[in-house]
Design a protein with these regions (language model features):
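C-terminal active-site subregion of NodB/CE4 polysaccharide deacetylases
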Residues: 2-177
């Protein structure tokens, strides 16, 4: 999100032209570089793609088709046990987070998550480049309010929420703090 919107759109158009010229296809899926997205960039992506993937872990869900979570499988996270474990994770039927823009110009310590169900058995974890961030959890009807103990540092801020109930449910979200 550090490029201008015009630069991002031009890069997408150029990339699509190169792919079309060399492979004869037009991609309809997008992966945000390093998972770094913003609401403004998502608006551009919606013009050219059917769905987009972030770089945050979580169960596959179409709750937000332009910021889909995924589990990376690579040399660091590619053991057979991890693949088996990741493939059985379930998504929450409904999930939303506030603030809802993955690009955060001003860091903040307060987050509201809504799963549209009783959240008493849901736990959320926050982490940035300095490690885990502890906080206070307050339950309000179907919502969880988290007040973090410290301000997140610039870079990536990850949110992971889980619930164990006839399977493991997982919600993930990634912010990029400028």
């Amino acid at each position: 999100p550090l490029q201008t919107l015009v630069e991002i759109e031009n890069e997408i158009l150029l990339s699509q032209k190169i792919i079309m010229d060399n492979l004869g296809i037009k991609p309809d899926l997008f992966a945000y570089p390093y998972g770094e997205a913003s609401s403004a960039v998502q608006g551009i992506i919606k013009k050219y793609f059917k769905a987009a993937f972030g770089q945050h872990s979580g169960a596959f869900s179409f709750n937000d088709p332009y910021y889909i979570a995924r589990f990376p499988i690579n040399e660091n996270y590619g053991s057979l046990e991890r693949i088996k474990s990741s493939s059985t994770v379930l998504s929450f039927k409904h999930s939303s987070i506030m603030p809802n823009d993955p690009f955060m110009k001003i860091p903040q310590k307060r987050f509201v998550l809504d799963f549209q169900e009783n959240p008493s058995s849901i736990n959320c974890y926050f982490s940035d480049f300095q490690g885990s961030i502890l906080g206070t959890k307050t339950t309000m009807n179907t919502k969880l309010l988290y007040e973090l103990d410290r301000m997140p540092v610039p870079g990536r801020l990850r949110v992971n929420c889980t619930k164990i109930d006839q399977g493991t449910f997982w919600y993930g979200y990634q912010y990029y703090l400028n």
